[in-house]
Amino acid sequence: MLSRIIILAVFLNLNVSALANDAQKENKKIYSGEKLKALLITGGCCHNYIFQSTALTSGIEEKVNVEFTVINEGGTGTKAQIPLYDDPDWAKPYDVIVHNECFANTVDPEYIKKITSVHEAGKPAVVIHCAMHTYRAAKIDDWRRFLGVTSRRHEHKAEYPVIPFAKDHPIMKGFPEKWVTPKDELYVIDKLWPNSKPLAYSVSERTGKKHAVIWINTFGSARVFGTTYGHSDETFKDPVFIDLLARGLTWAASKL
């Protein structure tokens, strides 16, 4: 009888410890309120989007109470129009949209406006790496206004120091004084749009110019968080980068 009581006590203690650990993990999350719904749109040229999607969603879900839906369509070329946007309510089920796609040569203005009009009406977004070169051949500026930056080219791959200069912004909380990226591409920023605010920069090894690499933007009534880094698998393995994306997503959704 005594042995049964001891076993039961040990069992209860283990369960209490497990519950306490779970609660501790929840408290450490950047956001642990009502579960957010996020849509990740990915696909296109030049990147390992299958790996990136897994690293991004699993990494952010550890830090934020969020559930991802992933749409990877359009193939691996530079030109595509995905059927998602044919539905005018394509973004309605989601609290925030993550763009990590690469379709530089898609130029149809009506197609592009199907995307940007939804964001301008208030749907928050996170934009990563080649999203900045997506639709770059288009004549209209709608996508670039949405991003908050204009970029048409990048420099060589290197390990670039990232220097924060908006340290008081909640997205940058806990960001290292100088984070050095894994091998990644530095995007040349030709223009910062009026409603965008840089949060960190890197310096070109070729020209010595500073280029914004992390920023926020207001597009219509939507919050947009962006970073030009995210080319390599190694970047998506870096906990500093995943934490940055998690904080950026939470901020865009007005939960930070």
Regions picked out by a protein language model, each given a short descriptive name:
Residues I5-N15:
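Bacterial N-terminal signal peptides
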Residues A18-D22:
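Boundary at the C-terminal end of the N-terminal hydrophobic targeting segment
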Residues A23-K35, E62, K92, R206-H211, ...:
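Extracellular ligand-binding/catalytic regions of CAZymes and related secreted enzymes
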Residues I30, K37-I41, Y49-V127, A131-H133:
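Helical hinge/lid and interdomain linker segments adjacent to catalytic or ligand-binding clefts
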Residues L40, F51, A55, E110, ...:
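Extracytoplasmic/secreted proteins, especially bacterial periplasmic and envelope-associated proteins
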Residues G43-C46, K157-E159, H231-D238:
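Active-site rim elements
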Residues E61, N65-E67, H156-V224:
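Catalytic beta-strand/loop cores that center a nucleophilic Ser/Cys/Thr
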Residues A104-G174:
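A glycine-rich, often tryptophan-bearing local segment used as a flexible ligand/cofactor-contacting loop or short
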